[in-house]
Design a protein with these regions (language model features):
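Mature N-terminal, pre-catalytic/accessory segment of carbohydrate-active enzymes
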Residues: 1-86
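Carbohydrate-binding surfaces of carbohydrate-active enzymes
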Residues: 75, 79-88, 93-490
Length: 490
């Protein structure tokens, strides 16, 4: 049966010997035996030359990056390129599927969630333990543990090792895309968060906004105080040799509006020989835009690069201006819809639990980051389940003057804390929303607006759009001391 009661789940590990033989006196009834073990994911890194190919390391334990770094980049940083000759390290696309276990998983889960994992393992394999709601809460704790290990033990440790050699670190998106995890938090360790965009633009697959959305990476950079947002730029499966600079400029403009400030061309290939027929050799046979010195439009590259350089220079000056801070919720595990309908004339950034709890405060009625980026409102969009600590932080922000838009959650998002967590949850929900189901609930210096759409709430608060325009104009607003400027394109 798919449903099973927690008190019916027995741990019979002690009945199995070292050779894997089970010697168990089976009680009355019908039993299903789950034999649980773990193996290497079986993935190798790629694409890579034969000499640089090997097994993927453990991403949920520091032993993985320790061995990987010492055996690869560390050999250069502490060898032929020591003394500052190597100044950076880039971790490219994930491309190694996912990992769900490490030897210390049970200890790590208890440390993170506060209760033992083993009896709940059937839920990982698709069983409903007790009921749907209880199982959903456990699975959130499970995914949060994996996400935290993924961020701290791999990316955090890899950056720590790189910094010991004076290397700046940039890496691309993976959390929330391949691995279910908080897609902002793991960027907090990056010196330069990185995303990617493809050409040509399209409504589906690789050229669409939602294939590899820019907004999560740009938001992570802003939330964690990183001024530069790099992008693997102009990647393509269509090696048709008919791309041109005007088309590439449009692709760049669209993604710059979403927050990209630094371009890493995909690809520029080394073409030292002069006896090849033009335009020369590309990267493989079918990926990337061929930036080559024998391209027909290469003579115009100086002007094109000057345009890109000027734009990206300005896009890193000052601070971004957005009205709405969109809280992605305590159940965040996948990438959001970048095409989600949003009020015209307003801009937003995403916010995650870690930033909400540890990096946000209120100043002059605005929600602010330590770097001074300001937001007029914080939006809770469809947050069905929440954590008590999240609600308590929201309450503290509202009392200091923050404006929160959104309805009360329907339930608790975790099994951690049990009755204590439920009491904290109930108290915070009552303090924030009280008996108000629609309208404004004033608390201290701030308020909670509920029972209406974001459009209606912004109107209720008498907030005017930053930009009023017709047609297909795209824009971005930045501000520095004494000046505002807008990047506008169509």
């Amino acid at each position: 049966e798919a449903f099973v009661s927690l008190d019916q789940i027995k741990d019979i590990t002690s009945s199995m010997d070292a050779n894997g033989h089970l010697n168990w006196e089976v009680p009355e009834g019908k039993w299903t035996v789950l034999r649980v073990g773990h193996v290497c994911t079986g993935k190798q890194n790629g694409p890579a030359p034969k000499e640089g190919t090997g097994w993927e390391c453990n991403k949920l334990s520091e032993t993985g990056p320790d061995i990987h770094y010492a055996s690869y980049i560390g050999r250069l940083a502490n060898g032929p390129l020591e003394g500052g000759l190597l100044n950076g390290m880039l971790l490219d696309s994930w491309e190694c599927e996912t990992q769900t276990w490490t030897e210390e998983m049970e200890d790590e889960f208890r440390l993170k969630s506060g209760y033992p994992l083993r009896q709940w393992l059937p839920a990982v394999f698709g069983y409903v333990v007790n009921d749907h709601e209880t199982t959903t809460r456990f699975l959130l704790d499970w995914r949060n543990t994996i996400g935290s290990l993924f961020a701290d033990k791999f990316y955090g440790r890899m950056v720590q090792l790189a910094h010991q050699n004076g290397l700046a670190v940039s890496y691309e998106t993976a959390a929330g895309d391949i691995v279910p995890a908080d897609l902002l938090e793991y960027f907090k360790y990056a010196d330069i968060p990185m995303c990617e965009f493809w050409q040509p633009l399209s409504e589906s697959f690789v050229g669409s906004n939602n294939f590899k959305p820019i907004k999560p990476t740009a938001s992570a950079a802003r939330m964690y105080g990183k001024p530069r947002v790099a992008a693997e730029a102009f990647t393509s499966f269509e090696l048709t040799w008919d791309e041109h600079l005007s088309m590439l400029k449009e692709v760049m403009n669209v993604n710059s509006v979403e927050g990209v400030t630094h371009l890493v061309f995909h690809t520029y290939t080394h073409n030292p020989r002069i006896d090849f027929l033009p335009p020369g050799t590309s990267f493989g046979s079918g990926i990337g835009t061929p930036f080559l010195r024998l391209q027909t439009w290469w003579k115009y590259m100086l002007e094109f690069v000057n345009y890109l350089s000027r734009c990206t220079y300005l896009l890193e000056r000052g601070r971004p201006v957005s009205d709405v801070l969109w809280y992605l919720g305590d159940e965040i595990s996948n990438k959001p819809d970048q095409n989600y309908p949003f009020p015209e004339g307003f801009k937003y950034d995403y916010c995650n639990p870690d930033v909400l709890l540890n990096r946000l405060s209120v100043k002059n009625g605005k929600i602010v980051t330590p770097e001074g980026i300001e937001y007029s409102v914080l939006w809770l969009n469809d947050n069905k389940r929440m954590l008590p600590e999240t609600l308590e932080k929201l309450l503290a922000l509202v009392r200091e003057g923050a404006v929160v838009i959104g309805d009360a959650p329907e339930g608790l998002a975790t099994l951690s804390g049990q009755e204590s967590a439920q009491k904290r949850f109930d108290a915070a929900v009552h303090a924030l929303w009280g008996e108000v189901s629609k309208g404004c609930n004033r608390i201290g210096k701030g308020m909670v607006v509920s029972g209406m759409s974001l459009d209606e709430a912004l109107c209720e608060l008498k907030m005017s759009p930053d930009v009023t325009a017709t047609g297909d104009a795209l824009w971005l607003h930045r501000q520095t001391k004494g000046a505002d400027w807008y990047f506008v394109t169509a």
